[in-house]
Amino acid sequence: MTAMDHQFPSWIVVNESTSISREQLNYLLETYNVFYENQKNLHILYGQTEDGQLIVEGMLDIFWGVKRPIQLKIQDEKQISSFDLLNTPETFSSKGRMTRWGEFDDLYRISELDRTHVLASEARHSPEDYLSYHSTLTPYADEEPESPLLYRTMSEAALVRKRMRAPEMYRKDRMGVLSNHRASINGHVYDHETSIFTPTFGSETKVRANSIMRTEEVIKQLLQKFKIENSPRDFALYIIFGTGEQRKLKKTDVPLLQRLLQGPSKSNARIFLMDKDAEEISRDVAPYINFHFSFLESILQRLDEEEKMEIERIMAKFNTERAFILKCLQSKQAAKTETTV
């Protein structure tokens, strides 16, 4: 027995009705980490908190199974930086508040920019942008224009280019900013038109969890990772087994320990984030889930027939026993009458 065995309690609580011993935990951790031997970042490890409490920590696989649409937040906790094309101080409010993406909408206009700003912006464009521009607009000549009218025309052409390129560059900047502040769901990040959507069923994500985090805390962690506005109370965690059984985790469950109990293989069991009112599927019903509807109907018909036959058998037995009892009562009553006489 090691010194760590003396420090930590002998039993680890999984939920209000389930606990595992230290020996079981060590075995489960060893099995899990051997399974992911070549993926060290997926290992689940244990240590202790400052107050000496045992804690298990690692990455928890969670699969999307929600049916109700989810709402992505319109903004992140950090202020969004200006996009490359219009990065002048006047672009943003002087107040130190959070910038909403919608505030960029009024930037699609032609403002009076001097020639220096125009040339500086062109120097930052990629060769593809340069070719795209010069395929539709006349390039600048090496020498200065011969008349102010020509200079004004060329300047406006560059400004038109700036306005035409702004939406694409804005989109690139917006996607870049988002990647620094939120995780994407299957490549989906916030968009005004698709901010409300439903993730693909069975798509996988990961969240860092520990043995102190109960079910609701893990849900909050997941929603925070993707900046989802929906309340954690709208969702629940379910374990879906390879047999088809679907069981809802209790509020007192520790999802990370439940993952350890089911083993590392995702083919045996997976943890899903689902709507809180999703139905549970018992172990007895689970084997029939994947059968064809017509086959299930034939099974029900067979069960109905067997039920009717069983009812008829019981009724026949009841009538036989009832007749026998009545006959006995009648014979005893007749014997009593004869004795009295």
UniProtKB/Swiss-Prot annotation:
Signal peptide: none annotated. The gene is Rassf6. Involved in the induction of apoptosis. May act as a Ras effector protein. May suppress the serum-induced basal levels of NF-kappa-B. The keyword DNA repair does not apply. This is Ras association domain-containing protein 6. It comes from the Eukaryota. GO terms for biological process: apoptotic process; positive regulation of apoptotic process; regulation of apoptotic process; signal transduction. Residues 285-332 form the SARAH domain. Interacts with MOAP1. Interaction with activated KRAS is still a matter of debate: interaction has been shown in the mouse, but not in human. Lack of interaction with MRAS, NRAS nor RRAS2 has also been reported. The keyword Manganese does not apply. InterPro entries: RA_dom (IPR000159), RASSF1-6 (IPR033614), SARAH_dom (IPR011524), SARAH_RASSF6 (IPR049787), Ubiquitin-like_domsf (IPR029071). Keywords: Apoptosis, Phosphoprotein. Gene3D superfamilies: Phosphatidylinositol 3-kinase Catalytic Subunit, Chain A, domain 1. It comes from Mus musculus.
